[in-house]
Amino acid sequence: AVRYLYDLGHRQIARVGGPESLAHSYIRDSAFADVASELGMRYRCLHTDYTPETGSEATKRLLSFPEHPTAIIYDNDVMALAGLGVAASQGIKVPEEISIMSWDDSFMCTAAYPNLTAMGRDVVDTGKQAAGLLLKLIDGERVGHLMEGPYELRARASTGPAPAEEKMR
């Protein structure tokens, strides 16, 4: 996701994640920071509780900075939709002035306007893996962890080339 935004010309990005105490938040934060640093991008990470309210608050905070990010990646579709709403309420055009991406890729991504670019995965396969682990637990077996991913970038209308410097707020 970070490389995709870099390839679109974005150099200042942000991530709105879930609680820092969750393992997948830590993993995503680390991967985000590592790739952004490797590419020489400026970045910020804010953490929320996954609700639309905190997604909105985080978006407002990010957009209040004099040099706000030109792209934001949200940890779920609910917060990304809230981010779209904040951008619209502030007259910021998506994707012309800011690109917005999500994790999860639920049906909400294609119902939103503009359609949300998202990182998605095969939920049926993930469900099968989870069911298999549950059956092993029921049988008294020790089980490992359900691994997240692999994810696939599903590019849609909410991401585009970074705005020219003079267009940035």
What are these regions (language model features)?
Residues A1-R169:
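Bacterial carbohydrate/catabolite-sensing allosteric modules
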